[in-house]
Structures are given as structure tokens and as C-alpha cells.
Amino acid sequence: MEALQARKAAEQRARQAAWKKRMDAYRRKLAEEKASSGHAGHFFNVAGHVFQVCIPASLDSQSVLKSYQPFACGPSSDLLFTLSLEFVDDLANVQVGEVKECLNDEPPYFWMFSRDGKYDFGFSYTRSHPDCIVAVSDDFSNAVVHVSSGKPDRYISFAVDNALMLMYAARSIAYDTLLIHASVIRHSDAGYVFLGRSGTGKSTHSRLWLENIEGAELLNDDNPVIRIVDGEVLVFGSPWSGKTHCYKNEVVPLKGIVRLSQ
């Protein structure tokens, strides 16, 4: 019995190694194709998860990916996902199927499309039409975000940021990781998270800590990351901090969560 279990375990490890080898080869091929098509790959590490963003080389990466620079890292074959930015003449030409949902009470509005059992997504400033479309692979390991050509830079950053948050949330959850909507204060090497719906005063509560508690620092003001590592619950800064420019590549143990309501 033990010999049979050992053989099955060895076979499983071999299958996993073969799968990883195929995926590494696929990702290298994808990167080469993007490079040959005039795309530049950029790698970022958020809460220990590395992902790749491929954007046209003609774009100023320091501008489009400004908030990600503190999280920049070297190339990796062990990627959480890869996102590519593509420009199209007309978003209406991107085949995504019928609209199933348009969610959220305020921007960004979140669109869901369904076609032949496959889902794609979109984001927008208004409910009238999507401003970008995110076409994803079945396992969310690869995605392309489509933006109309000639759009102002803010539309490009809007599309990339929201697509990355979608991909990160979907892929990282399998690794004891949550991207949450909250404001986080760091104090005495510990993190305190303030949760609540938009408008309930998360940022205001953090500001009160900053103004009244010595040594308090803002870690992130909109979308921090919580992850369990070796049994310890940690809270990380992220490139996504809403209207507040607070993009800290830092981590502290999570000591408290407060849910605000009014």
C-alpha cells in the first residue's frame, strides 16, 4: 500500500513538473510574441505574487505604470498572470457576447459579458458603454485589455488598473490572498484595516489616526492586500490606492479590522 501511494505521489509530481514546463514555455512564447509585436514586458511583485504587464513600447511606461514602480522586479517564469494592453479602432468590434451585468453604484462600473459559456469583462466611467474590455483565459492566467485608439492617457491607466485588480483578485485567492476595499494604518509595526462601503469614512478615519496618534502612517488608502503566510496574517501595501497617492511596497502583521457604517 505504501509503495502504491509513493508511486502515485511520484506520478503526480511528474505531471505537475511537466505542466509547469509547458506553461513556462507558453509564457516565454507569449513574451517573445509581444516583444516582436512592439510590446514591452514589465514585472511587478505585489504581496509576494509576480505578474507581467505588456504594453506597447511606444507608450511611456513611467506614466502609465507610475504607481507600480515601487513594486517593480526582475523577470520571472513563476507568474501569477500576464496582462497585455491592445489598442483597437472600435471597442464594438471586440467579440464578447451579450451583456449579463453592469454592476456598482459608482465608477468604475463593472461589466460582465457571456458568450458560449465564456465570460469577459469591462470597466467604464458611466453606465452607457464600457470604456475598456478585458478578455481573459479560462483560468485567468492570461488576459488582454482592449482600449480604443486615441483615448486620453487617463483612460489607458483606468483600463490597466482595473484589469490588473480583476486579474490579481481572481488569481491570488487560491494562495490565501485577498485584495480588499479598505484603508490601512500602520502603527507600531502593526496594521489596522478600516472597512466599509464607499462614503462611510474609511479615509477620514485613517486621517484621524494620522492627525491624533503619534507614529501612525498610511499604508494604503483603497485596496490593500491581506495574505496568510506560514500561519501569520499579513497586510501589504499595493499599487492601487484610489485617489490617494500611497503606493508602498511594505508589509506588517494584521492586528485589527474595523467595519465602519453610518
Label each residue range with its predicted role:
Residues K202:
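Conserved lysine of the Walker
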Residues H205:
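Hydrophobic positions on the alpha1 helix immediately C-terminal to the Walker A/P-loop
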Residues M1-V193, R197-S198, L208-E217, V225-Q262:
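A noncatalytic interaction/capping subdomain that flanks phosphate/NTP-handling catalytic cores
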